[in-house]
Amino acid sequence: MEHLLAGLNRAQHEAVTATEGYVRVIAGAGSGKTRALSHRFAYLVNELGILPGNILCVTFTNKSANEMRQRIHALTGDNDTGYINTFHGFCVSVLQEDSHAVQYPKSFLVLDNSDIDAMLGIIYGERGLTLRDMTYSAARDMIEIRKLFKEPEYYKDMITVSLDTLREKYERADTAGDIIFYGYLYQEKKCFGLDYNDLIKFSLYIFEQHEDIRLKWQQRLEYIMIDEFQDIDALQYELMEVLCGYHGNLFIVGDPDQTIYTWRGANVKYLLDFDKVFPNVQTIMMMENYRSTPEILAAANSLIAKNGHRIKKDLLPTKPSGEKVVCHFADTQEAEAQWMVGEMKRLHDRGLPLRDMTVLYRAHYVTRAVEEALMHEKIPYTIYSGVQFFDRMEIKDALSYLRMIAYQDDLSFRRIANAPKRNLGKRRMAFLQETAEKEGTSLYVTLKNHLEDSVFSGTKAKQFVDLIERFSHSYQGRPISEVLSDILDKSGYEKALRTEGSQERLDDLAELKQSIYEYETSCGEESTMEHYLAHIALFSNGDVAEQGDKVKLMTVHAAKGLEFPYVFLCGMNEGIFPSRKVRTLPGMEEERRLAFVALTRAEKGLYLSEADGWNFDGSPRYPSRFLLDIDRELLSFTHEVDETLLREAADDVARRDKYLREDDGDGTLPIGQRVRHAVFGEGTVLDVDLNKGAHVIQFDGMGTPRSISLRAKLEKIGP
């Protein structure tokens, strides 16, 4: 036991050993909560004898889950690390075990955005829609909004209604929104595919309808731990309530000062009111910070103290003193960027690698001047956005080959049947689609059944079928990395990339193989092809890091949960950070929490900067209120402060604050309310955007939702 508890501070020790009942840990930024969680898991296993398979540990990103698995493996020496997942990843486990309860096979597909876009392509082609009717991005958003708000019971159709009935519903649809929505549900059911929204909905349905399955999972999960509890949404909370309903051993960790996802459905009240909902809650405050210098923490504490609705607490430093937080006022954005790059060069000349330096910002458009300055000085950098690793063409193709081997589904077939070229172009694919519809078979089975048809003469269709047949009968029991290398070689895919001279794509494939090898090593016997494909479909931004000595650029939201030796927070101007879109007092407090998150990413050095000039609307640009919030003695200014500028900035903040509303819901309609607009006709309220002061309404005759001012006249239809 000593080695598990050694080195823990009092609060961490208390969190690790408080194993029974309901426990809430308020853990400040950099306070070692990941260490406490991993040691608590190991304590349950090594000291109390709890089986890893009886513990559920929920994190909010796959990267966090992987880090947690590695830490726990190092502590326990056991490859069995139980259920360490995101909520969506855990639901995949539930559905893989109990998919029979919803008439789905264990080999269901977890759909990502590229899969959804492929389905949309089929729907648009069949029904004559174009991107003028609705872009794919808007269609994905519309589908998600309808699933969450307008038709939250949609999943019952996917479970209980026949495929033919769903197709009839799709064929009867006459508006762009209905065509896309019902066409998508039909395509989902046709290939037994589930998107992120479906995973939790289907799991909750199973637990609601099948008491034996619910009880099985409740009894199995003797201990439940949930990280980042301030980010939990209503569906995740409902799932948590179900799972802990038998043993009542629930351990949650969160920080209300880091609630920055309310726009995505997160609700900090679940953390703040935890002791009001559950009995005999033990609350532990974990405030010692092991990340940042006292100077950085003092500035962060000073900033967040200006929020009124919070648990009053301060982060306590444990690291030795460093340099004061630097603050720079520039005349222009170009001058701001040049100053930042000059500071980076100074740090680099001291021997610090560029990868230790990170630029954070509230909005992407702020980076233009920074990028230009970096390029001018020939300083390499990478932006953590754009095409992420698992969305790159060659990676999607490689994973589609694996999915084709395991599932032989239509989405994978469409992607790789002609990659590399096999002379299976649009005409032959159209023939396959039409024939498959008539015969009620998949595209791959249709191709197998019609190989001798004249339409496939002069193609490599038979070689493709032989390849898939050979691998589909031999892949089980083989290492996934070996299967991937083999099929990329036998298919000619890698050879085609070499012929094209696509070294970067070949490097990406090498990285994929290495990541699969690491997955196999960490998962042991659980590393089946099916498990891996479900695991990889859940990956999101930031799960694969860029390599090399480069300056990193990313939004503050993307930096959540990360830490960097030196942070440059730029664009600290009113209207940029905080965003000009903020319309409410709670919205402004969330912006301040976001700034707090940005400051607490820094370990050794923190640089804050703003640029004078003019906003998009022609108004003068002033320093951010967040710079004014920090006590001046905690900052080191690069030049003498212009007191007139600061007074004007304070006056500007006071003017803006007059227009901030209390978030009391006055004048808003409930989500799901049917309404009638004088011009747009009837529609349904999908959301209320208090920051914009608008209802988000999907009108029946329009393809995309509209934001309608709260002041606009709307007639309620029905209750």
Feature-to-residue mapping (PLM):
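Helicase P-loop NTPase motor core
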Residues: V25, S31-L37, P279-Q282, M287-P380, ...
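Conserved helicase C-terminal RecA-like lobe
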Residues: Y170, P353, T367, E371-I379, ...
